[in-house]
Amino acid sequence: MIKLNNIPNILTISRLLCCPLWLLLFYFDLYIFCLILIVYSGVTDFLDGFLARKYDATSIIGKALDPIADKIFTSTVLITFIVDSRANFIVVSAIIIRELMVSGLREALSNYNKSYLLEVTFLAKIKTASQFLAIFILALVPLNISFSNTIYSFGTIFLYVTAILTVYTGYKYVIISIKELKNIES
């Protein structure tokens, strides 16, 4: 029987399993199922954190795995969007590099101070919402909707907004991390 406090981690792990499924669906041009997978990923990303907090089921594994699952799935989707020209290589590279950099900073800071957690800023949450919208909208493009060009334009705008917020919040995280490392070393 599944314990209630395991559900958040199960949801997180299911997002990791979505990556190979996404690639398979994408390869076979099953775009409606790709869209469903994006919605599933967004819903489970919200639910795992919500349930973990509500039922006091947060765990070290969950705190570590949740952002990794998000980054891997998001990166997988964005890279496939480059492959079929729905996304710009430089924009996607900026997003992925920032995510890796912030993850590295979090890891470095936690090595110095096990209790330190690089807090997610409000602007970073806006970035995440913009990124989800960009991905969702861009996933609509190949569904042969009569206004695909308009959808593509909106998705691209959200992706560029995401990239700008990504670079800015990444910069802010670097500044915060440098200050924290100086405090730890002194």
Segment roles from a protein language model:
Residues 54-107:
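Multi-pass membrane catalytic core of lipid/isoprenoid biosynthesis enzymes
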Residues 16, 36-39, 68, 93-96, ...:
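Residue-level signature of the transmembrane alpha-helical core
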Residues 33-36, 61, 65, 119-122, ...:
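Alpha-helical membrane-protein architecture signal
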Residues 75, 102, 123, 129-133, ...:
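A general structural signal for well-ordered alpha-helical segments in protein cores
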Residues 86-88, 149-153:
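Membrane-water interface of transmembrane alpha-helices in multipass transporters/channels
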Residues 1-12, 50-68, 110-129, 179-186:
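Interhelical loop and helix-boundary elements at the membrane-water interface
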Residues 87-89, 116-119, 133-137:
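Short, structured loop/turn "capping" segments at alpha-beta junctions
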Residues 1-47, 128-145, 149, 156, ...:
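Topogenic membrane-insertion module of multi-pass membrane proteins
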